[in-house]
Amino acid sequence: KFDLFVEETVTETGFGIELPVKKITVSAQSHELVPVRFHADPAQFDRTGDPLTPAKLNDRARSWVYEVSGKIVLANDTEKLRVPYHALVRAAATKHTTESRIALPNRNLVSLELSLEGDSAHPKPLVSVFELAGVSPRNNLLTDAADISADVLAFGVASDYPQSGSVAETTVYFAISNAGPWTNPHSFLYDPHLQIDTNFDGWIDHELASCSNGGFIKDDLTVSGYADDVFLSILIRVPRAERGLADVGYLNVFPPDEFDTVPFNNSVMVLPIPARMLGLDEEKTDFDFRVLTLGAEQYGYPEIDRTELIRYDVTKPVVHSAFGINGTVMYDANEPIKIAVDRGLAKREGRRPAVLLLHHMNTDDHKLDIVQLDLDADDADADGASDDDELAAGTDPADPDSVFAILPASRKTALGPEIRWHSVAGKSYQVQRAASLGQAFETLPGLLPATPPLNVFIDKTAPKEGELFYRILKP
């Protein structure tokens, strides 16, 4: 006969274990099944680390694995049997885009809002947004989890040059999405190399990689004994006299004491780097790059994937996506994703752009979305609005005088700028405002019902000085 109870070692708010049966009897040379019920309410997870472990290493915030552990104990008067349990627990999401293809209107710079659907148990789910650089087919011959975690599915790039206006102040963001999750992004477990050729001679000049603070301090990414839980974006092969590594920021952009970016048990990552650290300036603004991924140290760092070289100019992004949190590519996945697309540039250079979104909190079932951008949407009446947009707005796609657009009669009044547009019965509208086309548009309060044939709106909250840009949305 045994009494059953639980000894908890590491706990997490919202997680628990229940033993429906508290006593069992096991006859000689037989066995009994003991039910154990694990339950979790991710809304209660407090995402705090082990209180006995320092929150910082070398004054850098560390990332945490949120775990629970303990023992299920079977005891009687003469003996105790202990069955250990351990689990990694985190609040997850099921976010995804509502559209896989968007037709762009006939304008040079197009502002877009990408809507996301799905739930999130995490209070601050993150999604990062990039210009798609390339996709890589799934290697179905790989069977080991360590190899699958290095199999590239998609990669992307972004630049905040449209916001900074200076190469010296520009940050470049690289995105990698793989077929399976790594346990953690240490190079001896998963070894990504974002390889960069800045002089176009076919030789790699720099490599961007994930690394821990310990490996950076020791100037060696390969020794597991140097590893810790402060994850960085590291530039390798920088031509410096003393060291071969340069710290260029946190992996996934934010320090973990600001945002939970889920570096552990994930298959997506973001590697940021200041453009100047690649030797770029106002005269030299472009480079070639690719992704090379290697498997685990225990298998001899086998090459798992190698993409084609892609050219990128930090001053000429087609997809402008650095409108996220703190002016980065990281967004709150509970809010619409605001980006801009330089359709004119894409048309001039013959590019077929797409948007890559990485879902950092999602379960492994859906970690990325790709949204194709159609540059030549159907526009039968050549009024600058696509037929699909006109049908949605209620205007006539065959009549160039019937178009959902701000009218030239809009003017400045003593109360503020007056905006006019053709309206259609039964529709409603929202007004958005921005100080420049390179900035995200702000939605002004209030849903405006249609007053056909014309709607008039006065922006009484507009700043008195400076240029303003407006647009009208039909939600």
Residue ranges of predicted features:
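Short acidic, flexible loop segments centered on an aromatic residue
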Residues: K1-G14, L88, P192-T198
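Intrinsically disordered, low-complexity Pro/Gly/Ser/Thr-rich segments with frequent PxxP/GP/PP motifs
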Residues: F15-D59
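Short proline/glycine- and polar residue-rich coil/turn motifs
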Residues: K23-E32, T261-N265, L448-P453
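A short beta-strand micro-motif common to beta-rich folds, especially ectodomain repeats
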Residues: D50-N76
